[in-house]
Amino acid sequence: MAKKSMKNRELKRQLTVAKFAKKRAELKATIVNLNASPEERFAAVVALQKQPRDASASRLRNRCRLTGRPHGVYRKFGLGRNMLRQAAMRGDVPGLVKASW
């Protein structure tokens, strides 16, 4: 299991990303807009750089919902490989069956 502090840090990052998502999208649109003046585009770049580092969605890490494990997480289920296997063996995941050939 991941430490509580790591889980909380990731949760805090998710909240920060959600808080700044709209403003970041506006600034990025201004930066790519070729019709905007160079001063406006530069101001948008500066404003984007002044935002918190954790406001970027690329800082998020997929973690297992049950254990907080950072690696081996299946996006479709939101579970780590170990927890997914246990859930499948219990029959908690509909449609998922153990491979046999």
From Swiss-Prot:
Q: Which residues form the signal peptide?
A: none
Keywords tagged on the record: Ribonucleoprotein, Ribosomal protein, RNA-binding, rRNA-binding
GO process terms (BP): translation
Q: Which InterPro entries match?
A: Ribosomal_uS14 (IPR001209), Ribosomal_uS14_bac/plastid (IPR023036)
- A GO MF term: structural constituent of ribosome
One GO term describing the cellular component: cytoplasm
* Family membership noted in the UniProt record: Belongs to the universal ribosomal protein uS14 family.
Instruction: Report the protein's function.
Output: Binds 16S rRNA, required for the assembly of 30S particles and may also be responsible for determining the conformation of the 16S rRNA at the A site.
What quaternary structure, including any partners, is listed in this protein's UniProt entry?
Answer: Part of the 30S ribosomal subunit. Contacts proteins S3 and S10.
| Protein name, as recorded | Small ribosomal subunit protein uS14
Q: What is the lineage of its organism?
A: Bacteria, Pseudomonadati, Pseudomonadota, Gammaproteobacteria, Pseudomonadales
